[in-house]
């Protein structure tokens, strides 16, 4: 964003549209500014001064900073499994493993304009006059393109990638992402807890180069995620900071059993 007036009572965002917050006539929805030293007013909060490379922390009552444990995540993805449509990665099983403590730095660097399920707008334009659409949809007054949040475990172009009795905890974005072209795979008896974004993502939703209002209809049906089984898992405290996220989000998929 850029400051418009001084003193800094008014702020103009760099991209005039889409607006960083959903609005109706005369009413602005809430938006949030973070990581300012002036906002450090509640025990348990912290502030990172990027310029001086110092971290400031407001201790909780009774907390001894001489013995306190601090974990600072430095990586966004712990495990990445990716093949191709013609040569998918197959038959991997993870059992009784804890995946924890990841970060996701994009919102801190570029901001975060979420749409749904943690997907964020990378670009958008207003259309005037509005575009007429079929299927009884209302006329379209904008176009937008989406990005996909990072994940602690990312799987793409693969088959039979299983997770059994694993823990996914304290994560800076998505827990597990079966992104695209994943066939089969069991997630059974797993715990998803204390996660900033989605617990589990399955399916492509809207590829980066695909305008988000257009129906997703890939020419190669192998791109569609199919036959995943999510069984006897426990999801709690997901969407902790990105409130538009979900425990389980599955989009443009086939034959999934939850």
What are these regions (language model features)?
Residues 90-101, 139, 159-173, 182-197, ...:
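Right-handed parallel beta-helix
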Residues 12, 56-57, 177, 199, ...:
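Structured core elements
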Residues 179-180, 203-206, 246-254:
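Short, solvent-exposed turn/loop segments enriched in Gly/Ser/Thr/Pro and often Arg
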Residues 103-109, 150, 172-178, 196-202, ...:
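Short glycine/acidic-rich loop motifs that flank beta-strands on beta-rich extracellular proteins
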Residues 4-157, 162, 209-213, 217-219:
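Extracellular polysaccharide-degrading/modifying enzymes targeting complex plant/algal/animal polysaccharides
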